[in-house]
Amino acid sequence: MEIFYQKKPGTGLRTVSLNTRLAKRAVLATAGWIAAWPLFGGVVINEIHYHPASEDVREEFVELHNTGDQAVNLGSWSLRRGVRFKFPKVTVPPHGYLVVAADAAVFAAKHPGVQPIVGGWDGVLSNRGETLRLENANGKTVDSVSYADEGEWAVRQRGLPHYKHRGWDWLAEHDGGGKSLELVNPGLSNKHGQNWAASTVEEGTPGAANSVFNADAAPMILEVHHSPVVPQSSNRVRITARLVDEQKTGLAADLFYRPDSAEDYQVASLLDDGAHGDGLAGDGLFGQSIPACPDGTAVELYV
């Protein structure tokens, strides 16, 4: 069994504040696209450079990656939604890459030697986030990514003091900081920001393996819920989360929780045994519960 150590709250993990009078729910991700991934031909959206540090939109690019063992002809395929581009007759070799550039000439000057490239799309990638959709020649969606510059697509950090108070800010180096947005593990769904990260090198890695690539990354923690939504002082609170990984067995996660009266976090293991409000044993949904708390107690927790 491998153990992945995650950072404490303040670094992008899912945190929830519970109050027996008023409960606020965490921002939740949906599991989708987990079972059969990828759908068509193994081609996935693998890298997005949507906000160059230069602010020159002609430097934007999207990289596709063929994860399969067969070459894929993208003739008459299209990029839709965020930008619009129809592919010429171009083939992506097995386990190879194709760069789609906003302006092929500008890209070639900035990244000499990178091949193959196509380009000249209509539109501009949003700096705040939007949806990119890849369609095959029949108009069927092959892949779709809705990226963002906050939430699970960024890292939460302490903000600057403001009137003697410090709040939280989102840090996304791929948002104008000189980095691209790269897929960590193309063998897992790219629908979730947990499987993406800012490149570790300036300008990203177009036409090559991603700098953040990791075939054995920590499991994605999705669908974090608590129940009841507004707990009473007599209620134990059930916490559930779905773990998604390239391995189907041997997964484990811990729940850290702390009432506002406590200084240290308490730890409980999330279990997938069918006996902790987690549905069926072995279904990937993990559960645990925390004790009832007096009325008015706020509880911070993370998985």
Predicted regions and their residues:
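Hydrophobic topogenic segments
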Residues: 20, 26-28, 201
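Bacterial N-terminal signal peptides
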Residues: 25-38
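Activation on beta-sandwich/Ig-like modules and their edge loops
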Residues: 39-192, 215-219, 226
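N-terminal secretory signal peptides that target proteins for export/translocation
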Residues: 1-23
